[in-house]
Amino acid sequence: MNKFLPLLILIMSPLLASDVITQRQDSMQDFNKLMRSATQSLKSGEIDGLSQIYDDIEAIMINYPTLFPEDSFDGKTKASKNIIDDRSKFNQISSEAAEWAALAKIAADNNDLETLQQHHQNLYGSCKSCHSRFKN
């Protein structure tokens, strides 16, 4: 059994990495849908439902950095290996996005449309910042 454990790990590693790639792609698709919904609501001046949307976005961004283990950059992925080289910056951008989402949620709870729009723009800016550095 002990002889087969390293072989089993070697065989399973790409499968696990592939699963993580799928998880992060699914997570980003969920994030994109939520951002589109939030943008549409803001354009129409509708605040109802935005609190939950930003709560969901915050949860995604808190978890997102865990979906990029070092062995998950081969195969069908658009994630840049720069994430490995600059993990602290990647984590910082994700953390800032979570903070912007939390602040947007508070503004939505307070029916403060102007502040909500500012936090939404900052959240959107974090997307651009991350993609320009860490997406192939």
Regions found by a protein language model. Give the residues of each.
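Positively charged n-region of N-terminal signal peptides that target proteins for export
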Residues: 1-4
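Short helix-onset patch at the extreme N-terminus, typifying the N->h transition
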Residues: 6-9, 23-24
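Hydrophobic h-region of N-terminal signal peptides that target proteins for export
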Residues: 9-17
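Processing junctions and N-termini across compartments
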Residues: 11, 121-124
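Extracytoplasmic c-type cytochrome modules immediately beyond a signal peptide or single-pass transmembrane anchor
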Residues: 18-120
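The canonical Cys-X-X-Cys-His
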Residues: 123-135
